[in-house]
């Protein structure tokens, strides 16, 4: 969906520990913590970003802090880890923890892992070859 030159996609963010247990057969899919969110594709962002309340609800592991360039300038940010799914593609990525109420973002690291290219003219994502194994993913998406 294109809104004023922006590309928005429906994405599902999963708790990576729950998701790993599911792929190993130790957890049911319905027990995997996840959030379906309308997310802005941001080709100027390296990593995805989620509001801190969503990070908390999903129980995403926090891996520390790093200096980062964000829309408001350079600042210290917290990094969490998540599994991200868009259509039939998935990625594992660090996620920048942003303030409550901010728009969820999908940056270039996750886009490239999923094999998506953004076309700014049409405002659409195009599928290329993903870095993540599709066969395993297809067997887990229901």
Where would I find each of the regions flagged by the language model?
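Pepsin/retropepsin-fold aspartyl endopeptidases
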Residues: 1-142
């Amino acid at each position: 969906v294109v809104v004023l030159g922006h590309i928005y996609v429906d994405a599902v963010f999963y708790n990576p520990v729950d998701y790993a247990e599911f792929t190993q057969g130790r957890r049911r899919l319905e027990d995997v913590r996840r959030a379906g969110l309308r997310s802005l594709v941001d080709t100027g962002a390296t990593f995805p970003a989620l509001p801190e309340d969503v990070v908390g609800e999903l129980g995403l592991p926090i891996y520390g802090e790093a200096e980062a360039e964000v829309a408001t300038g350079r600042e210290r940010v917290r990094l969490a880890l998540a599994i991200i799914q868009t259509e039939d593609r998935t990625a594992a990525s660090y996620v920048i923890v942003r303030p409550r109420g901010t728009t969820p973002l999908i940056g270039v690291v996750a886009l490239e892992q999923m094999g998506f290219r953004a076309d700014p003219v049409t405002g659409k994502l195009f599928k290329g070859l993903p870095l993540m194994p599709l066969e395993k993913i297809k067997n887990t998406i229901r």
